């Protein structure tokens, strides 16, 4: 199961109807029939108006390798100057010459250790993935265009500079990363897509249309070489089979258009809806869950459906996050620290189909739930370093008190296998699973 939770404030945008973009870049209206062709890496105008149908409109992509040389821009010079100043101040004051120490050693957990990262304060970690050919080689993403790389299973991390592929004076946040074998994808906001075919040794930027509805928030490498799915926070789903030269839409309209069209169905909160998804989750069958930014209802989509399907909720409790369980059921995290699990596999019909789990969250909000691939152990994380685990399918939970001293909100928990897992938080906090 793959999930992304969109952090930060999103300004809703009204989308009265879907926009279709051809290779010529003309808006035809009606459906998402979009060919997102390769474009110039340093521009956002990715469509070429003089291209003919059937022609390769993409220009040769700029690549950045592990040893690529580049010029240093103003942003990079300022960052280096700040790092030097902070380090010098630490040495002068007689403290350890470690400019960015996030409290290593304060954690006393039997399950997790905190990893020192070469990051500035304030960076929020957003996603992590390892190459399919080597579980020791992976990448970590975050705000402020953060990309870190590990070759020892996540014990140590080094900064990976991909700024040569990005527009200057634009602060990107990398939302999602996915690998299938040595082929990998990274997406971010403002709209940016990076692609590798050699396990991340070299990356290229692939152009995205400025007409893309919403911001890309989730990317999944789905199959053989060149195949991927991309989702935006407005519910647009695209898939490619030719390494992003062309994209085909899987749905015919945004979630706003669907809800405003189906307002007569009685979906609470659907009338004149102009919001976005706050959480999007995908299971191994290619089915999606999308939680509204208000937390009062959610929508689902399965391959072959033309539209997202609204799911009403009658409960007053707002949902913070939700996703799929290993058995195909649904989990919900409600505001205030509650956990609810659907009683059966598949999609529940009513709120009564959920049962509240026993957890003493102390009122701290829970932000994500993950599990080992075997499904034997569930983990949930949240505010003020809160970590809980369950060994009975999520019915009863125990608190890991060893993380109480972690001074961070923990946003994401992901396991690559039963022995390799990570928790991602704000202020550059990364916890690595070490077992009991």
Protein language model annotation of sequence segments:
Residues 23, 29, 80, 85-86:
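A periodicity- and composition-biased signal for non-globular, repetitive helical segments
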Residues 88-94:
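Hydrophobic h-region of N-terminal signal peptides that target proteins for export
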Residues 62-84:
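N-terminal secretory signal peptides and thylakoid transit peptides that target proteins
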Residues 19-21, 68-70, 92, 196:
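Intrinsically disordered, low-complexity segments enriched in Ser/Pro/Gly/Ala and basic residues
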Residues 76-84, 95-436:
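Residue-level hotspots at or immediately adjacent to binding/recognition sites across diverse folds
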Residues 1-66:
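N-terminal chloroplast transit peptides
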């Amino acid at each position: 199961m793959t999930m992304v939770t969109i952090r930060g404030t999103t300004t809703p945008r009204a989308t009265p109807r879907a926009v279709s973009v051809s290779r010529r870049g003309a808006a035809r209206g009606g459906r998402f029939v979009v060919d997102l062709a390769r474009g110039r890496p340093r521009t956002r105008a990715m469509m070429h108006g003089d291209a003919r149908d059937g022609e390769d409109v993409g220009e040769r992509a700029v690549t950045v390798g592990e040893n690529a040389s580049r010029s240093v821009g103003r942003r990079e010079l300022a960052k280096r100057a700040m790092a030097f100043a902070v380090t010098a101040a630490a040495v002068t004051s007689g403290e350890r010459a470690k400019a960015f120490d996030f409290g290593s050693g304060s954690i006393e957990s039997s399950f997790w250790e905190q990893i020192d990262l070469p990051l500035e304060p304030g960076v929020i970690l957003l996603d992590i993935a390892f190459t399919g050919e080597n579980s020791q080689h992976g990448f970590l993403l975050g705000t402020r265009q953060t990309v870190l790389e590990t070759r020892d299973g996540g014990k140590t991390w080094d900064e990976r500079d991909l700024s040569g592929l990005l527009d200057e004076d634009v602060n990107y946040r990398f939302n999602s990363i996915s690998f299938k074998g040595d082929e990998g994808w990274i997406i971010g906001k403002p709209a940016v897509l990076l692609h590798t075919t050699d396990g991340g040794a070299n990356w290229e930027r692939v152009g995205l249309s400025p007409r893309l509805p919403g911001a890309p928030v989730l990317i999944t490498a789905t199959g053989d070489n060149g195949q991927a799915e991309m989702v935006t926070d407005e519910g647009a789903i695209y898939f490619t089979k030719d390494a992003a030269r062309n994209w085909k839409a899987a749905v015919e309209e945004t979630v706003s258009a669907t809800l405003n069209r189906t307002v007569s169905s009685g979906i609470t909160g659907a009338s004149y809806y102009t919001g976005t998804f706050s959480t999007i989750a995908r299971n191994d069958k290619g089915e999606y869950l999308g939680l509204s930014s208000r937390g009062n209802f959610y929508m689902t989509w399965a391959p072959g459906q033309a539209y997202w399907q609204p799911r009403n909720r009658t409960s007053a409790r707002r949902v913070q996050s939700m996703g799929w369980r290993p058995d195909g059921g649904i989990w919900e995290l409600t505001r205030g620290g509650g956990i609810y699990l659907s009683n059966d596999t598949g999609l529940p019909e009513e709120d009564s189909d959920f049962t509240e789990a026993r957890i003493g969250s102390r009122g701290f909000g829970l932000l994500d739930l993950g599990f080992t691939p075997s499904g034997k152990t569930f983990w949930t994380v949240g505010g003020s370093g809160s970590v809980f685990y369950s060994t009975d399918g999520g019915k009863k939970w125990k608190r890991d008190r060893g993380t109480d001293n972690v001074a961070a909100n923990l946003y994401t928990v992901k396991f690559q296998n039963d022995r390799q897992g990570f928790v991602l938080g704000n202020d550059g906090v990364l916890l690595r699973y070490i077992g009991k």
